Amino acid sequence: TEKIREGGVMYSDYALGQFFEEASKKPWFEKTLFVIVADHGSGAENELLRTSPYSHTVPILFYMPSAGLKGITDQTMSHLDIMPTLLPMLGVNDSYVAFGHDAFDPSSPHFAVGYYDGTYGIVDGDLFYQFSERGLESLFNLKADPHKKIDIKERADPAKVHLFEAYIQQYYRTVAERAFTPESWGKEVAQ
């Protein structure tokens, strides 16, 4: 399996190289914003990397040749943050519905939400919250306890728990009501 994984990485590297070699010859290349991201982790040989939330850790790359964007960050973000990050980069200021945040806005909260092992998991800095329909099930400090052996749920910040529960509830409401556009929110929310 390690050889298969290595082959997949080598192929991806080759394919991206070929793509960018051809794309760089096109007139639209310089002003195009490219987003490169995986949809899941690699299933690495490391046991820890096969558990949540690590199994969903992937890099994301924003590349626009004419923008001169440079830098690396290890801040928490997720696929949900891609659209809210791209729109300001592209100069779009219209209203939109999104459950993510602008990764480059320091005033935005930076947490990632995923569905792991039958629970909603939220990574917020070093903390990993796990929620079920009953509420907060567990809380781990990933930096101090990467193998998630010590549940520190009793030390959870009630304001954060409330925020994350509201986030999950709003997600369900939006999906159930198919409220994906500002027009579908109702006048009191859209303004």
Task: Give, region by region, the residue ranges found by the protein language model.
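Solvent-exposed soluble domains appended to multi-pass membrane proteins
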Residues: 1-191
